[in-house]
């Protein structure tokens, strides 16, 4: 769970914590609270959890002078808002925010290895993941083959309840988000995006009562369209074609986000050269979403401040003090 990445270093640093959980995950919240309450090594009051659908409780935490640190995972817009609200207290903020992860696929990439991963990078959590691979940047020599093969995979993908082992992708969190994602797709098409796979809300059958959204693939020429630049937080993928390495890197960096990226190539020298040029906190080479607890994770620019995981995760929750003693002066 994302919450544990903030809670664990806070407890390791010896702090007490108040955790605000979203109302949409009430069952998970209750389970976490029960596990923590039963942990014999945690003193009563070390971890305090509450759930809410609104923001009143969260606002009180941000406004409280006695709360020196806020660790937040969520959208960049909300991260900016809480930073501004807490600035008068000079609060310390650790912010894991939005992303618009690009996958750069070069002509020499192993498509058989890449395609299943590219599909999963869009459909895991139905795209409701800050590291969702939502931008596909493909070198022209392989673009047609990749487009056709990925489209076939997305069209054949089975949407259904997450508890059903036959499902390839589960639902969005609620119907309001289905409407939000569909609105973004419609606006993109109206602005010139070309439909490769037109998914959309499931409106018929037994799934119609749920918040199910079939994956969508749009090809775009304009890198400044909102669907390319703004986090969609749903199973919507844009495809852009580039000619050469420098153009691909420029497209990858043409975003206010900088959380993660993927590079697909058999050329090891190029893989590391491109990875160093991409402005993102995590870059995978021929893979996606390999995150290790022992290594620091976080974003550049609008994707956040600070780091989670690794030793650096403690930095948000500790203060450094310098004590100097002059001997013989007493």
Predicted regions and their residues:
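ALDH superfamily catalytic-core signature
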Residues: 38, 45, 69, 77-222, ...
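Alpha-helical segments flanking ligand/cofactor-binding loops in enzyme cores
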Residues: 8, 59, 80, 84, ...
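Conserved C-terminal structural/oligomerization subdomain of aldehyde/semialdehyde dehydrogenase
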Residues: 67, 104, 158, 208-330
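Structural detector of well-ordered beta-strand residues that form the stable sheet scaffold
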Residues: 11, 18, 48, 94, ...
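Rossmann-like NAD(P) dinucleotide-binding subdomain of oxidoreductase/dehydrogenase enzymes
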Residues: 1-113, 242
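Short glycine-enriched loop/turn motifs at secondary-structure junctions
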Residues: 44, 64, 97-99, 130-131, ...
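A generic structural signal for well-ordered alpha-helical segments
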Residues: 10, 86, 150, 188, ...
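CheY-like receiver
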Residues: 60-61, 117, 251, 274
């Amino acid at each position: 769970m994302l919450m544990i990445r903030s809670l664990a270093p806070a407890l390791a640093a010896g702090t007490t914590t108040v955790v605000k959980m979203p109302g949409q995950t009430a069952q998970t919240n209750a389970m976490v609270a029960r596990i923590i309450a039963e942990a014999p090594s945690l003193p009563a009051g070390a971890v305090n959890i509450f759930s809410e659908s609104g923001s009143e409780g969260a606002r009180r935490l941000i406004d409280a002078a006695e709360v020196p640190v806020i660790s937040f995972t969520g959208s960049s817009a909300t991260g900016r808002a809480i930073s501004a609200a807490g600035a008068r207290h000079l609060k310390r903020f650790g912010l894991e925010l939005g992303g618009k992860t690009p996958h750069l696929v070069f002509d020499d990439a192993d498509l058989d290895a890449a395609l299943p991963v590219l599909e999963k990078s869009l459909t895991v959590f139905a795209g409701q993941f800050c590291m969702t691979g939502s931008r596909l940047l493909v070198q022209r020599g392989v673009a047609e083959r990749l487009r056709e093969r990925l489209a076939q995979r997305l069209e054949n993908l089975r949407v259904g309840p997450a508890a059903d082992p036959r499902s390839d992708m589960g639902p969005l969190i609620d119907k309001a988000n289905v409407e939000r994602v569909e609105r973004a797709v419609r606006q993109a098409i109206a602005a010139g995006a070309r439909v490769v796979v037109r998914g959309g809300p499931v409106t018929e059958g037994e799934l119609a009562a749920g918040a199910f959204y079939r994956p969508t693939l749009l090809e775009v020429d304009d890198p400044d369209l909102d669907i390319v630049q703004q986090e969609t937080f749903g199973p919507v993928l844009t495809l852009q074609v580039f000619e050469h390495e420098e153009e691909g890197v420029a497209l990858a960096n043409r975003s206010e986000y900088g959380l993660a990226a993927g590079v697909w190539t058999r050329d090891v020298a190029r893989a590391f050269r491109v990875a160093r040029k991409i402005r993102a906190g995590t870059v995978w080479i021929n893979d996606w979403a390999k995150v290790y607890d022992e290594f620091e994770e976080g974003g550049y620019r609008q994707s956040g401040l600070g780091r989670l995981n690794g030793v650096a995760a403690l930095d948000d929750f500790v203060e450094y003090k310098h004590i100097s003693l002059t001997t013989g002066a007493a």
